[in-house]
Amino acid sequence: DAKVSEKFAKSTKRGPLNYVKSAIGEYLRYRSQRYKITTPNGVIAEKAFIIACGNASQYGNNAYIAPNADMHDGLIDVTVVLPITPFDTAILGLLLFSKHIDQDTNIISFRTPSLTIEREREGIIHLDGEPIMMDDRIDIVCHPLSLNVFSRLRTPDKGNFFTNIESSFWDFINSIRSELNV
């Protein structure tokens, strides 16, 4: 995700098509890394494709990486995407836009007030929409209710095509994937 952002930021062309081209190119070159995630509740050691941390549910553009996130609970929502196949990528894309990514078998999700991520090497991360270089150790802490923001009144979410699809459909997809071992 961070490499795609970096490539897209350096590109002279804009628009969704150029973003998709950047994403496909980076996906084909990217190799998952082994990560160690330490929280107050324990340690997780996994090889991962993406680790996303935040206190809001959206990546942006109606892509929900942490559908149950609450900006007021003082917790960081962590979504770990385990190594995936091209087939998994298509399914995860649908789940990302339907607010059901946390139901996929290739996802580990949890909440914590703080965490440390240790990875094999330093590299680019995606921080609030910007690609930046970080060390092989990243410490993350939530400072609850510390940012004051002015905004319009919130209106009820009426959903969209994807959010109105029944979750049983995703159970069906996951059962097929399990049977096919993908």
Stretch-by-stretch model annotation:
Residues 1-182:
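Long C-terminal subdomains/extensions of small-metabolite kinases
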